[in-house]
């Protein structure tokens, strides 16, 4: 959508080794053939793409990365590895893939469903480092301190991180949600005092998403009344 609506000159890089992609429809996974449409380059060392590409672009300070996960804590540390004890997990996921390298070297935008079981004060495993435990946390672990999580985008609103404390706060909520709704679905104390209501999306953009970008409704479900 970014390339179609407001950032036509952006370059999409995928952790599976694909660079400068221009998919017509939204891909279902990082290995989806849709990503190869008009793809500019296939990186040869796919196993290390998460670190090699991101380390290079970190030096150029030109990368914004997107990641997801099963759990997130107040400082933007993300778990996409397992639920429960690491050696005897209740559930094992496919992470990290390239997510650790991405979160290490990039400014990230984290996308998640907003549920109390996902927004936890302490996550079961740190797959992708955020601001660790606050100011100086990344530097203490030898991670670049000039990059880190910038936004958390959920189905209820947009959250940011305080510049001084590095702790998450609610910046904006959708017309279909409210600060109270966000708090009810968050498993830790969250500052909502700065939150503003976002405007409803442009109908033309909604039409573009439903009819051209995601016509198969892989990610965006069309309400029955809108069909």
Label for each model-derived stretch:
Residues 24-208:
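Conserved phosphate- and dinucleotide-binding cores of soluble alpha/beta proteins
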Residues 8-15, 37-40, 75, 214-227:
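Short, Lys/Arg-enriched charge-dense amphipathic segments
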Residues 195-227:
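Acidic/aromatic/glycine-rich contiguous surface patches that form carbohydrate-binding/processing clefts
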Residues 1, 59, 213-215:
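Generic detector of contiguous secondary-structure segments
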Residues 1-23:
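N-terminal low-complexity or amphipathic/hydrophobic leaders
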């Amino acid at each position: 959508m970014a390339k179609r609506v407001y950032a036509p000159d952006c370059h999409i890089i995928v952790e599976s080794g694909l660079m400068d992609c221009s998919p017509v429809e939204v891909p279902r996974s990082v290995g989806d053939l849709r990503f190869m449409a008009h793809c500019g380059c296939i990186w040869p060392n796919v196993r290390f793409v998460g670190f090699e590409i991101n380390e290079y672009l970190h030096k150029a300070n030109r990368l914004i990365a997107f990641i997801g996960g099963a759990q997130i804590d107040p400082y933007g540390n993300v778990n996409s590895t397992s639920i429960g004890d690491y050696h005897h997990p209740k559930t094992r996921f496919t992470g990290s893939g390239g997510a650790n390298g991405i979160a290490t070297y990039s400014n990230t935008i984290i996308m998640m469903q907003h549920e109390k079981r996902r927004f936890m004060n302490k996550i079961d495993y740190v797959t992708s480092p955020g601001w660790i435990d606050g100011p100086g946390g990344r530097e203490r672990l030898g991670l670049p301190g000039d990059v880190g999580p910038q936004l958390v985008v959920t189905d209820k609103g947009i959250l940011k991180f305080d510049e001084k404390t590095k702790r998450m706060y609610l910046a904006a909520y959708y017309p279909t949600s409210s600060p109270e709704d966000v708090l009810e679905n968050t498993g830790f104390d969250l500052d909502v005092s700065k939150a503003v209501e976002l405007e409803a999306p442009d109908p033309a953009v909604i039409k573009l998403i439903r009819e051209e970008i995601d016509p198969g409704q892989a990610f965006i479900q069309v309400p029955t009344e809108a069909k």
